[in-house]
């Protein structure tokens, strides 16, 4: 490194994998741009078509298959988190007029949801940082919604991030080029 030269913290980190097939790349980009709360049917059918098509880009198909599986898992998990939030809202009221300590059953459900979230994030390999960030962003938002409505949660809830900016490499600010 030269004196006075700029050095970017993640200049050697690839944010997205290399996909050669244009159709697979387009579906991959659509998935990464979509909200995974409720996947559109058109996106699901495009993914199935791209994954099953005959192409030389087997690596691209494998990457898209991983993203598709993650999106489906996030969609299902988001449904569970929204159900928990709605149950909590029904219990304490939308404005908190019936505030009371959480039931043991609800505390256990929150702990299981948090533990599964942390375990799922830990399952991504070093070459899947892009996917981990997307999952972290999608599920982190829902967990934060639960966290804001509850008091007395353990310090482990501090691990939940909103924007998935748990590191400088690939952070929201860096990707925006600010």
Model-identified regions with their sequence ranges:
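Membrane-proximal amphipathic alpha-helices
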Residues: 137-138, 145, 151, 158
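Charged, alpha-helix-enriched surfaces in structured cytosolic catalytic cores
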Residues: 134, 138-141, 162
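N-terminal organelle-targeting presequences
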Residues: 1-125, 129-132, 154-178
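Positively charged, low-complexity, intrinsically disordered RNA-binding extensions
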Residues: 142-144, 172
């Amino acid at each position: 490194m030269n004196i006075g030269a700029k050095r970017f913290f993640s200049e050697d980190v690839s944010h997205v994998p290399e996909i050669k097939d244009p159709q697979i790349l387009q579906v991959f980009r659509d998935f990464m741009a979509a909200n995974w709360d409720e996947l559109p049917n058109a996106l699901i059918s495009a993914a199935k078509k791209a994954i099953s098509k005959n192409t030389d880009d087997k690596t691209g198909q494998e990457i898209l298959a991983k993203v598709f599986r993650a999106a489906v898992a996030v969609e299902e998990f988001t449904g569970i988190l929204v159900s928990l939030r709605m149950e909590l809202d029904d219990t304490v009221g939308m404005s908190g007029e019936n505030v009371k300590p959480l039931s043991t059953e609800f505390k256990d459900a929150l702990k299981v949801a948090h533990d599964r979230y942390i375990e799922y994030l830990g399952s991504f390999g070093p070459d899947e940082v892009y996917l981990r960030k997307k999952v972290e962003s999608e599920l982190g938002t829902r967990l934060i919604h639960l966290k804001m409505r509850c008091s007395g949660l353990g310090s482990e809830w501090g691990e939940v991030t909103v924007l998935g900016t748990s590191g400088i490499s690939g952070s929201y600010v860096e990707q925006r080029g600010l």
